[in-house]
Amino acid sequence: MARDRTRPEDFTRPLRRILVGGLVLLLLGIFLIWRIDSPRVEQFRAALIDRVVPSFEWLMTPMTKVAGMVENFQSYTRIYEQNQELRRELQQMKAWKEAALQLEQKNARLLDLNQVRLDPKLTHVTGVVLADSGSPFRQSVLLNVGARDGIRDGWATMDGIGLVGRISGVGRTTSRVILLTDTSSRIPVTVQPSGQRALLTGDNSPSPPLEFLDKPDLVRPGDRVVTSGDGGVFPADLLVGQVAQGPDRRLRVRLAADYGRLEFLRVLRSHELEPISDPGKLVAEPPAPPAPAAVEGADG
């Protein structure tokens, strides 16, 4: 079959060759122009650049915008990664800070309670909190010291900072501590600097109220509350806490002891009062009955 010379590919193939050849010659000419070191050629190159480059500025603007967007995205990615890394480091630092504070508090308590048990010459005995034996209606804790360590009912307990409660129930190796927040707790206290006497009564709340204040107007929130020593219940001047006003407008005490972290308690040895064996000089002695011999001599 004879080929049809009127087909389009018979004309496009020579045209394609001509265009490719012309493009090669153009590129070769540009290369030669850029490589020739001559003043005239240099002027021609400068004129060509001044003519062509400004006309391509509109074409370079989108490319510049795209390049700027890519650079901004890369910068945002780097900032986001740095932010995430800083957040992780901040969380780790917070955890380390909390652990350091707990260790610092525990170390301070251990340093304050380092005189551990069983020497009768000590003024206090240190015990470890075994368990929280309290309930919604009874707030108390158990200690690992008891009668074998000389512990007795009624002795005050502290956590190294403030008063915690009193001993109520002593076994051979353990003892129970009734907390100041228990409803059965009644502690005579003094509010400083006014010197007002009051009774700290537990009501199962974290901040027990002050009762029987003579002059409540003299008491201000933030005043220091210590034991008064009245009645020989507790030694005087033991730190209890600070005065605070509750939501019910009653004067309450924000306890100094950290009830949320009771690990070690210091049991204060109270000095017993000497029993009174004679009436003393303030009470007159009854008159002695007359001797029988003296009575008979008078009759004779």
From Swiss-Prot:
GO biological process, one term: regulation of cell shape
Residue ranges of coiled coil: 74-117
Localization terms from the record: Cell inner membrane
Parts of the chain on the Cytoplasmic side: 1-17
Descriptive protein name: Cell shape-determining protein MreC
Keywords of the record: Cell inner membrane, Cell membrane, Cell shape, Coiled coil, Membrane, Transmembrane, Transmembrane helix
Protein's membrane topology: Single-pass membrane protein
A Pfam family the protein falls into: MreC
Function description: Involved in formation and maintenance of cell shape.
Gene from which the chain derives: mreC
Periplasmic-side positions: 39-300
Region of interest (Disordered), residue spans: 277-300
TM stretches of this protein: 18-38
Gene3D superfamilies for the chain: Rod shape-determining protein MreC, domain 1 (2.40.10.340), Rod shape-determining protein MreC, domain 2 (2.40.10.350)
Gene Ontology CC terms: Gram-negative-bacterium-type cell wall; plasma membrane
InterPro entries, sorted: Cell/Rod_1, Cell/Rod_MreC_2, MreC, MreC_beta-barrel_core
Family: Belongs to the MreC family.
Species the sequence originates in: Cereibacter sphaeroides
